[in-house]
Amino acid sequence: MSQLTHINAAGEAHMVDVSGKAETVREARAEAYVEMQAATLAMIIDGSHHKGDVFATARIAGIQAAKRTWELIPLCHPLMLSKVEVNLQAQPEHNRVRIESLCRLTGKTGVEMEALTAASVAALTIYDMCKAVQKDMVIGPLRLLAKSGGKSGDFKVDERHD
C-alpha cells in the first residue's frame, strides 16, 4: 500500500515538496451529480428559474473554484491551470444533473483536487440556486474519473462496474 504523502514520520501534516519533480502535462476529470424532482429540473432546462441561468452560474462557480482550490484545501499547492472546463448535462430520465470537470496544466503536481473541487462547487451552486423550490436535492456521488501525467501514472475509472 502507498504511503500518505502529506504526513511525516512524526504523523504531522505537511505540504509535499515538489521542487525536485519534473514538469509534465497533467490532466484530471471528475464528475458529480445533483438529484432533484422533475419539476425542479424542468425549471432549469426551460430557463424559467427566477434566479436566472442555473447552468451558466454553476459553470462559472466551478471554474472559479478550481482556480482557488489551494485556498480551500489546506495542503494543496497554488497552481497555474492552463485549462478548466465544466460541463453540465440535464438527465431528465434520472431527474438529475451530471457535472463533469476537466483541469489541465504543465507542472510538478497533479490537478485531481482542482477537478474534484470544480465539480463539487458547481453542484453546490445548483443546490444554492434551486433550494428555494426544493430543499431535499441530493448531491453525489462525486468522484475522480481519470488522471494522467506524473510519477504515480495514469488512472481511469473502470466504467464496466458502474
Swiss-Prot record:
Pathway(s) per entry: Cofactor biosynthesis; molybdopterin biosynthesis
Active site: 128
Keyword tags: Lyase, Molybdenum cofactor biosynthesis
InterPro entries: MoaC, MoaC_bact/euk, MoaC_sf, MoCo_biosynth_MoaA/MoaC, Mopterin_CF_biosynth-C_dom
Record-listed E.C. numbers: 4.6.1.17
Pfam families for the chain: MoaC
Molecular functions per Gene Ontology: cyclic pyranopterin monophosphate synthase activity
Residues in coiled coil: none
Lyase recorded as keyword: yes
Domain of life from the UniProt record: Bacteria
Signal peptide: none
BP terms from Gene Ontology: Mo-molybdopterin cofactor biosynthetic process
Chain sites annotated for binding substrate: 75-77, 113-114
Catalytically driven reaction(s): (8S)-3',8-cyclo-7,8-dihydroguanosine 5'-triphosphate = cyclic pyranopterin phosphate + diphosphate
Recorded family membership: Belongs to the MoaC family.
Its biological purpose: Catalyzes the conversion of (8S)-3',8-cyclo-7,8-dihydroguanosine 5'-triphosphate to cyclic pyranopterin monophosphate (cPMP).
Quaternary structure and interacting proteins, as annotated: Homohexamer; trimer of dimers.
Name under which the protein is recorded: Cyclic pyranopterin monophosphate synthase
